[in-house]
């Protein structure tokens, strides 16, 4: 009996595209942080595709899992996965990353579908995640 591989060819290709998209968005913007989005591409892909319960058609669904990116400067990790999962994010948002017409440099609640909370200062996401978890207990 052979074990099913952790990553399929499609997974590997999608992770490679995620890394390229992160590098291209930062290069086009002329600023940003490509390292974390590139290094976390595989982990983020597996989380969004295999572990997290969420619905791109209903980002505010109460039964969803919450993803809080505490290191907001690595926002492309989240934006790319939201895009690939089918959330209402245009590819053009990546080409105008960190500009008024594109995706924000840090996750901003209400600006990007699927972003649970605004993060920017390092560590702020931890407090936000605890608050979201406490609130979820009462839903």
Regions found by a protein language model. Give the residues of each.
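Conserved, non-catalytic sequence blocks in retroelement Pol enzymes and Pol-derived host proteins
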Residues: 9, 32, 119-122
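Cofactor-binding active-site loop characterized by glycine-rich and histidine/acidic residues
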Residues: 39-139
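N-terminal capping segment at the start of a domain
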Residues: 17-31
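Basic/polar N-terminal segments that are highly enriched at the extreme N-terminus
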Residues: 1-12
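Secondary-structure capping and boundary motifs in well-ordered enzyme cores
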Residues: 10, 14, 35-36, 70-71
């Amino acid at each position: 009996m052979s074990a099913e591989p952790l990553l399929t060819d499609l997974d590997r290709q999608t992770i490679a595209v995620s890394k390229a998209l992160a590098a291209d968005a930062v290069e086009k913007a002329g600023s940003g942080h490509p390292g974390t989005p590139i290094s976390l591409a595989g982990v983020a892909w597996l989380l969004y595709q295999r572990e997290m319960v969420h619905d791109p058609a209903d980002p505010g669904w109460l039964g969803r899992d919450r993803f809080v990116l505490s290191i907001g400067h690595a926002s492309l990790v989240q934006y790319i996965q939201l895009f690939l999962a089918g959330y209402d994010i245009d590819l053009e948002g990546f080409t105008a990353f960190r500009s008024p017409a594109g995706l924000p440099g840090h996750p901003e609640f209400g600006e990007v579908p699927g972003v649970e909370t605004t993060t920017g200062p390092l560590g702020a996401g931890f407090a936000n995640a605890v608050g979201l978890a406490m609130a979820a207990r009462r839903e």
